[in-house]
Amino acid sequence: RALLHGIILRTRPKKSAASYREVWTDEGSPLLSTGKAQTAGMKSRLEQRLAGPVEVELAMRYGNPSIPETLRKLRDAGAERIVMLPLFPQYSGTTTASAFDAMADELKQWRWIPEFRWIQQYADDPGYIDACERGRNNLTRNVTR
């Protein structure tokens, strides 16, 4: 405890603030701005594929918009079916299962629960692997110029 209060809490906030300033954008957190862009892209692709309107919302396990807040927003919008896709491609008890736990903690308080689908992992999905390969190729193409 002396180490925490004596050294860590006196030095870490200043170092962390400097690191955050380096990656923060005009939109704020890069995680949030990237998540919003992914959400918009997924909404567009799903609406094309399903030929109709689809609600796609971003939720964060340890941040805002939170999982409970987002689930309530979908419920209030009249969602009858929810598909939850964690952005962790591989399953892990500390990440994917933790997000599932947060979702379950919220839903167990509801009187009526919509139809629900949970995508547990997709690291070995051919479409995901191809997308990673295309992204890697684009990145290395830009780096080698």
Which residues does each predicted region cover?
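Active-site-proximal alpha-helix that buttresses catalytic centers in soluble enzyme cores
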Residues: 1-145
